[in-house]
């Protein structure tokens, strides 16, 4: 996805840009690695701002790849240093985006491979199912686990998510740090367009 660049940051429901291309959005808990993953996929460490502070992404960020596909970095859910009112605001914009965006082809739900699904992730999965939103699950920070532990976590998450009518297979894993799994995920994204 070389040539992908930041084009817009949206903080309210009336400002969504219309690129006329398919969109793939990335969601997950705060600090799961959404921005780092976008940087790895686009091979540009400066595309998406990253931070060790949870809740740093407080708007929906759009990255356009040569007019072919848009990658969308959604604010993290869960812990944030933002005020409750600000958090409610950007989560409302995110919900509106997910429910109304016709260009959205796939949501990629990121789960920290060291932690697995937390209750808030399971709640989000239920919400996606209730609203008929197609999604994939990708485990992040795979470089932090041994091959055996990673395989066990993939199986665990697969079992936890089983029965999802809108879950698209397979569950994948990536490491933004080492680059493992990035090419495979980019290929999977290209299949959405």
Swiss-Prot record:
Its cofactor is Mg(2+). Keywords: Cell cycle, Cell division, GTP-binding, Magnesium, Metal-binding, Nucleotide-binding, Septation. Pfam families: MMR_HSR1 (PF01926). PROSITE patterns: G_ENGB. InterPro entries: G_ENGB_dom, GTP-bd, GTP-bd_ribosome_bio_YsxC, P-loop_NTPase. One of its GO terms (biological process) is division septum assembly. GTP binds at residues 28-35, 55-59, 73-76, 140-143, 171-176. The keyword Manganese does not apply. One of its GO terms (molecular function) is GTP binding. Mg(2+) binds at residues 35, 57. The keyword Cell division applies. CDD domains: YihA_EngB (cd01876). Residues 20-193 form the EngB-type G domain. Necessary for normal cell division and for the maintenance of normal septation. Belongs to the TRAFAC class TrmE-Era-EngA-EngB-Septin-like GTPase superfamily. EngB GTPase family. This is Probable GTP-binding protein EngB. It comes from Anaplasma phagocytophilum (strain HZ). The gene is engB.
């Amino acid at each position: 996805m070389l040539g992908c660049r930041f084009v817009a940051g949206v903080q309210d429901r009336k400002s969504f840009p219309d690129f006329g291309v398919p969109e793939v959005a990335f969601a997950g808990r705060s600090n799961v690695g959404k921005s780092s993953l976008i940087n790895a996929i686009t091979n540009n460490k400066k595309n998406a701002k990253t931070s060790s502070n949870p809740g740093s992404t407080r708007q929906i960020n759009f990255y356009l790849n040569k007019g072919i596909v848009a990658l969308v970095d959604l604010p993290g859910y869960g812990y944030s240093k933002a005020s409750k009112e600000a958090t409610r605001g950007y989560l409302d914009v995110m919900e509106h985006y997910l429910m109304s965006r016709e260009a959205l082809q796939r949501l990629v739900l990121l789960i920290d491979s060291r932690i697995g699904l937390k209750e808030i992730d399971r709640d989000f999965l239920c919400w996606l199912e209730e609203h008929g939103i197609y999604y994939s699950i990708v485990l992040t920070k795979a470089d932090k686990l041994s091959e055996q532990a990673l395989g066990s976590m993939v199986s665990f998450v697969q079992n936890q998510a089983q029965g999802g009518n809108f879950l698209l297979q397979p569950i994948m894993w990536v490491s933004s740090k080492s680059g493992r799994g990035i090419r495979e995920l980019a290929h999977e994204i290209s299949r959405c367009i």
